Amino acid sequence: MFWINMALGLVVMYVVMFSMIDGLVDFKNNLNMFYMAVTMWAPMGIFMLATMPGMYPNRRLNLALYALFVLLTAGSFWATRAQALIDDRQFVESMIPHHSGAILMCREADLSDPELVALCGEIVEAQRREIDQMNRIAERLR
């Protein structure tokens, strides 16, 4: 049951990473979102083992799992920061949802400061233009 919980948790965390995109058209599977999901997921394994010891009585296995989850947390954090395995294609697949998030925030935020409202207008225009450009690049890279 532990691994079913963990597998479902990883899937949910990966999908939730995309809750900030402006629309489904900007959904792009990418390694950066996976790295971030693992960075959130692996500590959950530690918390589950630590807070429910009665459910996981095998001490030796638990110690091995603690070590695994610590390594996965550190490794995924490093992979995100180092942009490990992020090539041209992965770069645009990562940046499109990122830019889309800026559009969503500008559109949905309850802004009243005139300078911020104007800035958001510029952000939306620039980010959409850059998303279009990255989509063209992604097509070329396929």
Predicted regions and their residues:
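Alpha-helical membrane segments of multi-pass proteins
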Residues: M1-R142
